[in-house]
From Swiss-Prot:
It comes from Anaerotignum propionicum (Clostridium propionicum). Coiled coil: none annotated. Pathway: Carbohydrate biosynthesis; gluconeogenesis. Its cofactor is [4Fe-4S] cluster. This is L-serine dehydratase, alpha chain. Keywords: 4Fe-4S, Gluconeogenesis, Iron, Iron-sulfur, Lyase, Metal-binding. GO terms for molecular function: 4 iron, 4 sulfur cluster binding; L-serine ammonia-lyase activity; metal ion binding. GO terms for biological process: gluconeogenesis. The lineage of its organism: Bacteria, Bacillati, Bacillota, Clostridia, Lachnospirales.
Amino acid sequence: MKYDSLADLVVQAEKQNVPLXXLIXKDQAE
């Protein structure tokens, strides 16, 4: 999962209803 900007990361987090952190972590794990 790659994002063009931090804003895109926030939007995806809101859509998936998961903590940013979790997404970031998940992103780093891949």
